[in-house]
Amino acid sequence: QDLPGNDNSTATLCLGHHAVPNGTLVKTITNDQIEVTNATELVQSSSTGKICNNPHRILDGIDCTLIDALLGDPHCDGFQNETWDLFVERSKAFSNCYPYDVPDYASLRSLVASSGTLEFITEGFTWTEVTQNGGSNACKRGPGSGFFSRLNWLTKSGSTYPVLNVTMPNNDNFDKLYIWGVHHPSTNQEQTSLYVQASGRVTVSTRRSQQTIIPNIGSRPWVRGQSSRISIYWTIVKPGDVLVINSNGNLIAPRGYFKMRTGKSSIMRSDAPIDTCISECITPNGSIPNDKPFQNVNKITYGACPKYVKQNTLKLATGMRNVPEKQT
């Protein structure tokens, strides 16, 4: 359309829409391949390859699992009373103390991880007429035999092992986590040489719960020179409740309690390096930006993260349909 000017000249006004030589293909409800002039990617599909240590407090487990740090494996002593937002377990982590099992390992691991602390308070349990602080060459602490620092292995004193009955009230206003265990000797001879009785028993109770464990005597596969095992259990004592421990043998006693906290702490298995940087969202692959609404890096996340989707790409059309001019 020609428009007259004040000086009798004319100007040309072109009516149409913007087009670009190379548009972006997007999916719509009715068509898988629509070309538009511009589109924004909504899916974060890559990580930085490293875990940022800010703003979250990251605790690198190095060669210790969270449970080994909890029990006090000698090579994990550096984790005593530590705190974290996210505990990172490494594939190279290993146990280096008396061989043990935890019947409900995942639940204990999750419970401690969410608490975000290994804060430990020693208590004055009274164990009479038994020998305390048992150790083993399977658990070296320095040059000599040792044991888990948070547990107390009780054995006979002389030729006696009396029935033990100990109570410990919770007079504080927070939950207390007690870790204890039961020793399973490999032979009947080992059983009587340590505990006198041919069959031991351990009962741990509160007003809300009771657990009774009978040791299973028998040889297991050799681990660090031992064919015996220890089973690890735990009890939570609420404020105003009381812990009661009754045993006539095979007791691996607590030395105190872990102070339980409520929060959003967690645990993650990852071999990504930890670096000085800032990122709100962490995955096992590394930290990722959270400036997109979706991500397909990993289902497992910690922090303020985009929602996980299976799609590699989702685009939001921010321009019109692209119809480039055809030259003939």
Swiss-Prot record:
Organism of provenance: Influenza A virus (strain A/Qu/7/1970 H3N2)
Primary location: virion
Entry's family note: Belongs to the influenza viruses hemagglutinin family.
Entry comment on modification after translation: In natural infection, inactive HA is matured into HA1 and HA2 outside the cell by one or more trypsin-like, arginine-specific endoprotease secreted by the bronchial epithelial cells. One identified protease that may be involved in this process is secreted in lungs by club cells. Palmitoylated.
Subunit structure: Homotrimer of disulfide-linked HA1-HA2.
Localization of this protein: Virion membrane; Host apical cell membrane
Name of the protein this chain belongs to: Hemagglutinin
Residues bearing attached sugar chains per UniProt: 8, 22, 38, 81, 165, 285
GO BP annotations listed: clathrin-dependent endocytosis of virus by host cell; fusion of virus membrane with host endosome membrane; fusion of virus membrane with host plasma membrane; virion attachment to host cell
GO molecular function, one term: host cell surface receptor binding
Membrane topology: Single-pass type I membrane protein
KW Membrane (keyword) present: yes
The encoding gene: HA
UniProt xrefs under Pfam families: Hemagglutinin
Function according to Swiss-Prot or TrEMBL: Binds to sialic acid-containing receptors on the cell surface, bringing about the attachment of the virus particle to the cell. This attachment induces virion internalization of about two third of the virus particles through clathrin-dependent endocytosis and about one third through a clathrin- and caveolin-independent pathway. Plays a major role in the determination of host range restriction and virulence. Class I viral fusion protein.
UniProt KW keywords: Clathrin- and caveolin-independent endocytosis of virus by host, Clathrin-mediated endocytosis of virus by host, Disulfide bond, Fusion of virus membrane with host endosomal membrane, Fusion of virus membrane with host membrane, Glycoprotein, Hemagglutinin, Host cell membrane, Host membrane, Host-virus interaction, Lipoprotein, Membrane, Palmitate, Transmembrane, Viral attachment to host cell, Viral envelope protein, Viral penetration into host cytoplasm, Virion, Virus endocytosis by host, Virus entry into host cell
Gene Ontology cellular-component annotations: host cell plasma membrane; membrane; viral envelope; virion membrane
Disulphide-bridged cysteine pairs: 52-277, 64-76, 97-139, 281-305
Note: Major glycoprotein, comprises over 80% of the envelope proteins present in virus particle.
Gene3D superfamilies: 3.90.209.20, Hemagglutinin Chain A, Domain 2
